[in-house]
């Protein structure tokens, strides 16, 4: 895809994220790897008003185009691309259940085999840091090295993938897992978990099965 096509795909993903109930207002942000940096949503602009020319290019050193302001979270997007060379897209949102768990500062353990969509046997929750800060970007780099999906304490969710379709799909799956986990926690009962051995079997199967989404 060329820049205009990638920019439109970013906008389409933002609109779909809202349609799916994963985000609201101007919260959240989306990016794709481009050249030596990334294309990312602008700061503070409602998704339905975005045009392709509003999407901002930020190079690998964090320098952005003149007369454009990238999302305030551009630092952690860049940290994902630096940490995971295979990642070509990043989706960040404040979905209800993921944000709820993040407020509790709880990772999602192996409550269900689909936790393995993260690429590991749990979904981490990284420590709180102010949005847009270098410290938050550092926490994200540590967490995303371990898992393709991470919760940000008192904040929300980040997912990454080979393309935007996969990153958005992963965000949907993690939101469902978060909703299950919150409901389980509300029972006050001890929650049985899958063992590391059981999750390793699932992870092995996912390597050969995988998610086959071709970006449109």
From Swiss-Prot:
Enzyme Commission numbers on file: 4.1.2.17
UniProt binding sites for substrate: 28-29, 43-44, 71-72
Sequence positions that bind Zn(2+): 73, 92, 94, 155
Pathway: Carbohydrate degradation; L-fucose degradation; L-lactaldehyde and glycerone phosphate from L-fucose: step 3/3
Note accompanying the cofactor annotation: Binds 1 zinc ion per subunit.
InterPro entries (alphabetical): Aldolase_class_II_sugar_metab, Aldolase_II/adducin_N, Aldolase_II/adducin_N_sf, FucA
Cofactor: Zn(2+)
Molecular function GO terms recorded: aldehyde-lyase activity; L-fuculose-phosphate aldolase activity; zinc ion binding
Purpose: Involved in the degradation of L-fucose and D-arabinose. Catalyzes the reversible cleavage of L-fuculose 1-phosphate (Fuc1P) to yield dihydroxyacetone phosphate (DHAP) and L-lactaldehyde.
Stated family: Belongs to the aldolase class II family. AraD/FucA subfamily.
The protein, known as: L-fuculose phosphate aldolase
Originating species: Haemophilus influenzae (strain ATCC 51907 / DSM 11121 / KW20 / Rd)
Lineage: Bacteria, Pseudomonadati, Pseudomonadota, Gammaproteobacteria, Pasteurellales
Gene: fucA
């Amino acid at each position: 895809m060329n820049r205009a096509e990638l920019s439109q795909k970013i906008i389409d993903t933002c609109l779909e994220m809202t349609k799916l109930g994963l985000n609201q207002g101007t919260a959240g942000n989306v990016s794709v790897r481009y050249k030596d940096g990334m294309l990312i949503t602008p700061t503070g602009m409602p998704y339905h008003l975005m045009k392709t020319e509003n999407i901002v290019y930020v190079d690998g050193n964090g320098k952005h185009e003149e007369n454009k302001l990238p999302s305030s979270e551009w630092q952690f997007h860049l940290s994902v691309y630096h940490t995971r060379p295979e990642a070509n897209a990043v989706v960040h949102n404040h979905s209800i259940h993921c944000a709820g768990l993040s407020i509790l500062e709880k990772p999602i353990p192996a409550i269900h085999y689909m936790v393995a969509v993260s690429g590991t046997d749990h979904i981490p929750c990284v420590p709180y840091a102010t949005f847009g800060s270098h410290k938050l970007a550092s926490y994200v780099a540590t967490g995303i090295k371990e898992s393709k999906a991470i919760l940000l304490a008192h904040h929300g969710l980040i997912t990454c993938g080979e393309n935007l379709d996969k990153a958005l799909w992963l965000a949907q799956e993690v939101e469902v897992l978060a909703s299950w986990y919150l409901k389980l926690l509300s029972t006050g009962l001890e929650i049985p978990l899958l063992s590391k051995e059981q999750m390793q079997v699932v992870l092995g199967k996912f390597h050969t099965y995988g998610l086959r989404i071709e970006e449109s």
